[in-house]
Amino acid sequence: MDIGDFVKLELENTTYSGTVMPSLNEDTVVIKMKSGYNVGIDKKKIKNIEILESGDKPKYGLPPLNLEKNPKLKNISILSTGGTVASRVDYKTGAVHPAFTADDLIRAVPELMDVANIKGKVILNILSENMLPKYWVMTADAIKEEIENGAEGIVIAHGTDTMHYTASALSFMVNSEVPIILVGAQRSSDRPSSDAALNIIAAVKAATEPIKGVYVLMHGETGDTVCHLHEGTKVRKLHSSRRDAFKSVNETPIAEVNPFTKKVTYLREVKSQDRSKIKEVVLNTNLEEKVALIKVYPGIDSEILKFYVDNGYKGIILEGTGLGHTPETFFEGIDYANENNVLVAMTTQTINGRVNMNVYSNGRELQAKGVIPCEDMLSEVAFVKLMHLLGNYEFKEAKELMSKNIAGEINESINLEC
């Protein structure tokens, strides 16, 4: 028995005939009788079901908008990987569904029609905590396809939990002349405080700018006045629930974007695009997944490092204390990693500031054991960078490149106002 079938349902003392309708409860059969009334029947009370006539399952949906492209606007592709910003709510069931056809987007955020010609595509539908390195590769491949097919800017709708990891991965993997903007939402579209619509408007606007590179766009403060555009390798989620959870670290944001006036105010120098190469995309998606990120803490045991080495890991990022330190009791594990050609690099768990392993004897001894200081790199960025380097270079060259700036991840000096 399927939706659309005309059926006869026999109960203990009566029968009902009608067309099977969608039901919000899997234990209830709903039919529309010839009288026009709907009736719901508990499946347990049905003694027999007779299909009198098979029907076609009805197709639900709004008619297409049939919008024509505006030749004065740029063509922007919005790729959905899932998350709060990439969904709409079914108020009958409470279910959340992906909403990323172009028509879905325009119906949800009609202001987009004045910003760009929109194309929507779902490439993943996952919660961002379930993001995997192979999905970064899928996303990079989708970006390349869209650009080669005429997209002049890319917006990636992403869950916020791991969005900074993906931004970092794409920064190392994708070399193109178009802006690639990752956008999320902290509050779902059914909540009055939702940031989804304004973030998408601002992200699409940013994607029309004559810049290149990978960026994250989110609310710039708790109100609705401005959104901030952050460099993909210098941004981190710093609050679990606030709408302005994402902040640039050791750097100022690239720009402020007003989602109402569509004004973009640049706050520092930006990478300008070369329009003559707008369809050229170079991908390098090789990743070594056997890389770990370990937070250093008082009493940490060398056996932890030995575990990773013995299980075939090729690289370790240590999130050290202060300027980049570990307890001396951890040195044995570092020696073991070095003896087995496992690349070990150091970031700081203070988040702000930079590693300086020349100040104290602990840091100097760690360097003598082969630990690479990661300057002012964020731990998550260093983790992704090491995956990228070990996936593309031999050990010696990867070690040399770890402390060199490749995709904006290292600042020579830090603005004290950041």
Curated annotation (Swiss-Prot):
Active site residues of this protein: 84, 160-161, 237
Top-level taxon in the UniProt lineage: Archaea
Keyword ATP-binding found: yes
InterPro entries to which the protein is assigned, alphabetical: AsnA_fam, Asp/glu_Ase-like_sf, Asparaginase/glutaminase-like, Asparaginase/glutaminase_AS1, Asparaginase/glutaminase_AS2, Asparaginase_C, GatD, GatD_N
GO terms of molecular function: asparaginase activity; ATP binding; glutaminyl-tRNA synthase (glutamine-hydrolyzing) activity
Enzyme class: ligase
Enzyme Commission number(s): 6.3.5.-
SUPFAM superfamilies: GatD N-terminal domain-like (SSF141300), Glutaminase/Asparaginase (SSF53774)
Pfam families: Asparaginase (PF00710), Asparaginase_C (PF17763), GatD_N (PF18195)
Keywords per UniProt: ATP-binding, Ligase, Nucleotide-binding, Protein biosynthesis
Ranges for domain Asparaginase/glutaminase: 74-405
Catalytic activity, reaction form: L-glutamyl-tRNA(Gln) + L-glutamine + ATP + H2O = L-glutaminyl-tRNA(Gln) + L-glutamate + ADP + phosphate + H(+)
Entry keyword annotation includes Protein biosynthesis: yes
UniProt GO BP: amino acid metabolic process; regulation of translational fidelity; translation
Similarity comment: family membership: Belongs to the asparaginase 1 family. GatD subfamily.
Protein purpose: Allows the formation of correctly charged Gln-tRNA(Gln) through the transamidation of misacylated Glu-tRNA(Gln) in organisms which lack glutaminyl-tRNA synthetase. The reaction takes place in the presence of glutamine and ATP through an activated gamma-phospho-Glu-tRNA(Gln). The GatDE system is specific for glutamate and does not act on aspartate.
Subunit relationships: Heterodimer of GatD and GatE.
Protein name stated in the entry: Glutamyl-tRNA(Gln) amidotransferase subunit D
